[in-house]
């Protein structure tokens, strides 16, 4: 059930917000945005409230408190609207500041509108949704005034926050872990607008995610599909070695989609391995969306392979496609050899036999 909803146009260029009356036929749009934020979108990062007196948290708590005191029926909308307006104004201020910090880079904050909604089925299952959504602007052909609207087909959500709320028997309002989604690496949404504290740092997320994937691949593949294990492991490592916004589900999907195993017998097992990997964030306590911190994976870039007693092959640094440079073969009497592409002349000369 939707207890309360609001829609604001956020205009960074003019420094103004515009509150919009939501007509009945726009309810389906609001419901789709809510459904995306609460059910469909899995690429989120967990945050927690560190100060209940910050603008957004205080306003959300006040809206819920007003609904609770009014019995959740026949709500006094003017009071609720004033708190929603404060949240919209807070976003406007932070987007103006964010725009000023990137203007010299030739970039612009994505234009959009702010959707807010209070939903729930009982006092222990309440959620406040805040979402910045795509809108389009144009000039009216008759009045020549700028207006805006929403695309009927694509309903893009740029950023969102799902705030779970519980009310105990004494009327105390408690916030649960807040799920935040962003479409880029910008941190103003969570840190300066929502003013939340991340539950897991980017460093811990990066480390836990890679180690969890590495362990699952090792359990599932290393014994019988050793070459494929290293290929998939290095695909994951290669993706995480640069600082970027990392959507875990998307990355796993890209790595496995269309992958052609090197060894027989693996094809039929790939889907089940992929599904186990997709369950890891909850099992291993890392977020499905975070900014990668490549520096914590430096040791993971090092591999060692025993050749024979006294000889070891080491892979170091940022080399993640080493499998393309090393091939194995047997000679006519069954002796095993490794053939390594060498671009260093001095090393090559050491091992070159004179004709």
Which residue ranges define each predicted feature?
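C-terminal structured domains
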Residues: 257-355
């Amino acid at each position: 059930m939707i207890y309360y909803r609001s829609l604001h146009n956020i205009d960074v260029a003019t420094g103004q917000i515009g509150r919009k009356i939501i007509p009945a036929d726009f309810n389906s749009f609001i419901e789709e945005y809510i459904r995306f934020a609460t059910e469909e979108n899995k690429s989120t990062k967990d945050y927690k409230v560190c100060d209940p007196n910050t603008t957004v948290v205080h306003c959300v708590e006040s809206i819920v408190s007003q609904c609770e005191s009014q019995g959740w029926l026949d709500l006094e909308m003017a009071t609720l609207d004033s708190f929603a307006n404060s949240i919209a104004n807070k976003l406007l201020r932070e987007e103006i500041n964010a725009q000023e910090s990137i203007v010299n880079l030739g970039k612009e904050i994505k234009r959009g509108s702010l959707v807010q909604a209070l939903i729930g089925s009982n006092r222990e299952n309440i959620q406040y949704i805040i979402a910045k959504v795509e809108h389009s602007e144009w000039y009216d052909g008759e009045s020549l005034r700028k207006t805006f609207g929403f695309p009927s087909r694509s309903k893009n959500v740029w950023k969102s926050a799902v705030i779970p709320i519980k009310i105990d028997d004494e009327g105390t309002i408690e916030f649960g872990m807040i799920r935040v989604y962003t479409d880029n690496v910008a941190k103003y949404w969570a840190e300066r607008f929502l003013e939340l504290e991340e539950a897991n740092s980017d460093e811990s997320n990066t480390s836990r995610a890679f180690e969890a994937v590495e362990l699952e691949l090792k359990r599932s593949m290393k014994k019988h599909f050793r070459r494929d294990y290293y290929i998939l492991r290095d695909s994951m490592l290669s993706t995480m070695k640069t600082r970027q916004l990392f959507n875990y589900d998307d990355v796993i999907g890209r790595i496995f989609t269309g992958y052609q195993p090197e060894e027989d017998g693996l094809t039929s097992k790939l889907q089940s391995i992929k599904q186990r990997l997709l369950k890891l964030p909850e099992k291993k306590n890392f977020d499905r969306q975070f900014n990668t911190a490549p520096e914590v994976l430096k040791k993971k870039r090092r591999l060692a392979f025993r050749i024979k007693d006294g000889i070891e092959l080491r892979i170091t640094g940022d080399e993640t496609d080493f499998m393309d440079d090393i091939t194995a073969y047997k000679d006519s009497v069954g002796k095993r050899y490794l053939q390594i592409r060498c671009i260093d002349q001095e090393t090559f000369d050491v091992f070159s036999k004179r004709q």
